[in-house]
Curated annotation (Swiss-Prot):
Recorded GO MF terms: identical protein binding
InterPro entries attached to this UniProt entry: Snf7_fam
GO BP term, pick one: peroxisome organization
Entry membrane topology: Peripheral membrane protein
Name of this protein: Vacuolar-sorting protein SNF7
Keywords from the named record: Cytoplasm, Endosome, Membrane
Function, as annotated: Required for the sorting and concentration of proteins resulting in the entry of these proteins into the invaginating vesicles of the multivesicular body (MVB). Also required for the proteolytic cleavage of the transcription factor RIM101 in response to alkaline ambient pH.
Length: 228
């Protein structure tokens, strides 16, 4: 009945170490309280013996010391029990820790086995080869897509272009020379660079001076006619 409630025999065995650890700790705590009580009784009986001695009552002092000895004997046995329980608790805790560690490692091994169950070195190598092939295929496709379209017939030869350009230049030079010869002299003169001519400037100055003298002469004649 209890096995069915707690999950069977395996689950019960799994809970035994924890239950034992709990019970041992509880009993050690109980003995610790008993130890403190005995130590208090020993101190109290010793104080009683001192008190009776100061009063001169050796009989009562002796009885107090006897009780003290009894408590001391009980304390020795109790402390021995506590030592045994603590050693047992330490051993069970260590064993339980080892058990839990082994269970965890077993679960890890089972998980790794499950993961590797569908794998072997041949399959891994085969898969890696397939991946490499697909990567290479992808690179080839990328290179093919990146190449320019309409190559071959429409490809331009740079050397041929240079030769054609030289021929056009040779044909154009005589035509330019003929056009320059056919231009009127006035246009040719305009096309020539301006050269400063000092003689032309001097004659222009003389003409301007003569025009100024004529203006002054006409002005004087007008003044004379007006009687000014």
């Amino acid at each position: 009945m209890w096995a069915s409630i707690f999950g069977g025999k395996g689950n019960t065995n799994k809970e035994l170490p924890k239950k034992a650890i709990i019970e041992l700790r509880e009993h050690i705590n109980l003995l610790s309280k008993k130890q403190a009580h005995l130590q208090g009784q020993i101190t109290a009986q010793e104080n009683e013996a001192r008190k009776f001695l100061t009063r001169g009552n050796k009989t009562m002092a002796k009885n107090a010391l006897k009780k003290k000895k009894v408590y001391e004997g009980q304390l020795v046995k109790l402390e021995s029990q506590m030592d045994s329980l603590e050693q047992q608790l330490f051993s069970i805790e260590s064993a339980n820790l080892n058990l839990e560690t082994m269970r965890a490692m077993k679960q890890g091994a089972k998980a790794m086995k499950s993961i590797h169950s569908g794998l072997d070195i041949d399959r891994v190598d085969e898969t890696m080869d397939e991946i490499r092939e697909q990567v290479e295929l992808g690179e080839e496709i990328s290179d093919a897509i990146s190449r320019p379209l309409y190559t071959g017939a429409n490809e331009i030869d740079e050397d041929e272009l240079d030769e054609e350009l030289d021929m056009l230049a040779q044909e154009t030079e005589p035509q330019v020379a003929t056009k320059e010869q056919a231009l009127p002299e006035s246009k040719q003169a305009l096309s020539m660079p301006n050269i400063p001519n000092t003689k032309i400037d001097e004659s222009k100055t003389k003409i301007e001076e003569e025009e100024e003298d004529e203006d002054e002469r006409a002005l004087r004649e007008l003044q004379a006619e007006m009687g000014l």
